[in-house]
A protein has these predicted regions:
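Conserved HGGG/HGGXW glycine-rich cap/lid loop of the alpha/beta-hydrolase fold
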Residues: 1-46
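Active-site loop/oxyanion-hole signature of alpha/beta-hydrolase fold enzymes
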Residues: 32-76
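Gly/Ala-rich beta-loop-alpha elbow adjacent to hydrolase catalytic centers
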Residues: 77-81, 85
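Flexible "cap/lid" loop of the alpha/beta hydrolase fold
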Residues: 90, 98-128
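Conserved alpha/beta-hydrolase catalytic His-Asp/Glu region
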Residues: 132-185
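Short beta-strand/loop motif that positions the catalytic acidic residue
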Residues: 187, 193-195, 199
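Conserved alpha/beta-hydrolase "acid-adjacent" motif
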Residues: 200-206
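Catalytic histidine-centered segment of alpha/beta-hydrolase-like enzymes
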Residues: 224-233
């Protein structure tokens, strides 16, 4: 049996995978999916988010050890979660069998304006610094991360937000950790990159640059948005 560790992105939690985890397990018989929350998100919303991506890795490793789930692991990470996967693979390659990275962006391979599209600066700053009505917040995030008209998930997202509220301080801490992280120039772990051609948050050029740097496989979905598992899981 293979163990797949799912890692979500900025301010998102394991619940945001929705039905994708069950679909994944059905598609790959014999695999076990473990969706982890990063500190500050989900069931860990009362913890302070680490300011360094490697510290997020160590939290995940400790949690899996606590659950008696030994390596090797297959990692599937999206956005910030993909950065955690990369840092994990670089620091502990003996623990990682392979990794799938979805719509991620990494220093030093991509400029800031590709890692976060400028059209979103104003909205994200307003949400992070000034806050917003919960429905306005989640609807705004859905609008910039999905291209599939997935309004049906909004009530679920609002319920997750009410149950596990992410503080503005933790949102900023996660954003800072993501901005500061520098990826290795060489990757020895088998890696598959998945990118969305209609990603409105992160340019597909980031995954293309990473594929060139690491000489790894890249698959581009032509119509999905940033939240690829939501749009076409």
């Amino acid at each position: 049996m293979s163990t797949w560790i799912f890692l979500r992105g900025l301010t998102r939690e394991s619940g945001h995978w929705g039905a994708f985890t069950a679909q994944f397990e059905s598609a790959l018989p014999g695999c076990e999916v473990v969706a982890l929350d990063l500190p500050g998100n989900g069931s860990l919303c009362h913890q302070a988010s680490p300011l360094r991506v490697p510290d997020m890795v160590e939290h995940c490793r400790a949690e899996l050890d606590r659950r008696w789930l030994p390596p090797p692991y297959h990692l599937l990470g999206m956005s910030l979660g993909a950065m955690v996967a990369v840092a994990w693979s670089a620091a502990h390659p003996d623990e990682v069998a392979a990794q799938v990275l979805i719509n991620t962006s990494l220093r030093p391979f991509s400029p800031f304006y590709q890692r976060l599209r400028p059209r979103n600066y104003g909205l994200l700053l307003r949400l992070a610094l000034l806050g917003a009505d919960p429905e306005d917040w989640e609807r705004s995030i859905l609008r910039i991360t999905s291209r599939g008209g997935q309004d049906a998930v909004l009530p679920q997202w609002l319920a997750l937000r009410a149950q596990h509220p992410v503080t503005r301080a933790n949102a900023l801490r996660q954003l800072l950790a993501a901005a500061r992280y520098r990826a290795p120039k060489v990757m020895t772990i088998p890696t598959l990159l998945l990118a969305s051609g209609q990603d409105q948050l992160v340019s597909v050029a980031c995954s293309q640059a990473l594929a060139r740097q690491w000489q790894c496989r890249l698959q581009v979905h032509p119509t999905a948005g940033h939240d690829l598992p939501l749009d076409d899981g």
